[in-house]
Amino acid sequence: MKSIYTLVICSVFLSGVALAETITFDDLKTGGPPPGWTATQTGSGSAKWSVEKDGSAPSKPNVLKQSGQATFPVCIKNDTNLKDGFVEVKFKPVSGKEDQAGGVIWRVKDANNYYIARANALENNVVLYKTVNGKRSSLDIVGRKGGYGVKETVASGQWHTLRVEFAGNRFKLMFDGKQLFEVEDITFTEAGKIGVWTKADSVTLFDNFSYGSK
């Protein structure tokens, strides 16, 4: 049986090598949230995080699914504590009238304080934010003042890869293997947890959640 934890040696941003871990959810019981994760939300509503079987999963048979409705559903991996490193996930926006979004979060203090990078299939854009005391605000791209992330085709019903590499106050965002932009911010400087994120009524699938320290 395939282990949900796959250890690989991989190159990360800047220079050097880090030990990365990939979680596929494949050995977990379906129908409930993954053990060792905090399945919750930022704001009001009722998030629903569960491990489910899905025939389209990049790593079969299971995925992590968010099918509830809340301001910002988040699922946080409890045993992580990264200051500099990377986080990456494959995600598939399935449905949602208000939003069809998937994202990763890092330097998480709690469900109301973290950085978040997300891609949205309804808006066809990719944006990096900070969430402070439950309030989300977008961050300026290095070399550009103002604006709102970047326009990028995010096809609904298809799997995509979202990755953020972070070192100090600088964050590099990549989508489907292409670097889109970098951001600088000093709101959260200490190590924190990592996880995944959606918004509103987004039904989103996640698989191959990878991370490593620098």
Regions found by a protein language model. Name each.
Residues K135-T161:
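Short, aromatic/His-centered strand-loop micro-motif at the edge of beta-sheets
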Residues A20-Q41, D207:
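Extracellular carbohydrate-recognition regions
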Residues G32-V63, Q69-T71:
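Extracellular glycan-recognition surfaces and repeat-rich motifs
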Residues N169-G195:
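Short, solvent-exposed beta-strand-to-loop segments that form ligand-recognition rims
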Residues T30, Q66-R136:
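Secretory/extracellular carbohydrate-interaction modules
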Residues L7-G16:
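Bacterial N-terminal signal peptides
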Residues T24, F188-K214:
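Ligand-recognition surfaces built from glycine- and aromatic
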Residues Q158-K172:
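Localized edge beta-strand/strand-to-loop motifs within extracellular or lumenal beta-rich domains
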